[in-house]
Amino acid sequence: MKYLRVLIALILVLTPQSSEAATSKSLAFTAEVWADNWFALYINGKKVGEDSVSITTQKSFNSETIKFVATYPLTIGFIAKDYVQSKSGLEYLGTPNQQIGDGGIKFQIRETASNKLVSVSDSTWKMKVGNTAPLNPECEKSTQPDIDCKFLNTSIASNWSSSSYIDKSWSSAKIF
C-alpha cells in the first residue's frame, strides 16, 4: 500500500506513505532531504528529525541527512514550510525583488545497511496546503502587502501523520 501526502502551508505537509518490506524488525534508515526552506520528517506518526536551519532564516535551499530507526511498514510524512515575512505570503518585503514566496521539498529514504531505496518524492505523494497566500497575486508589488494581500488558513487534522489517516481529499503532489 503506497500513499503519501504533502502539506505546504507555506506549510506543506507531505504525509504518509506506507512502505512495506518482508520484515518487522527495527532497521536503520537514512533520509536525504532538500527543502526550500524548512521541513520536519515524521515516521510512523513520530517526528524523527527536522531541518537544522530555522524557518526564520531566509535561505534558498537546505539539505539535511537524517538517520532514524523504525520498523516496516513505514508511514512517512513531512511538514514543509517556505520562509515568509508575514501573512501576505510575500518574500523580501519592501525591496525591489519583493515577490510571491515559493517553496518545495524533495527527498529519498534508504535502508542504511543495504542502501535499498525505500521511498522517494514523486507524483504519487498527496499534499494539503495549510496556508495559502497571496490569494490575489496582483498584490505582489504592493507597498502595503499585509493589508492588500489576502490569505487562507486551512486546518490540518492532528492525526495527519498516522497510518490510519484518510487523505482522499488531498491533492496529488506537484512536480516541477
Where are these regions (language model features)?
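C-terminal segment of classical bacterial N-terminal signal peptides
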Residues: V13-E20
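Beta-strand-rich ligand-recognition modules
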Residues: W34, W38, Y42-L93
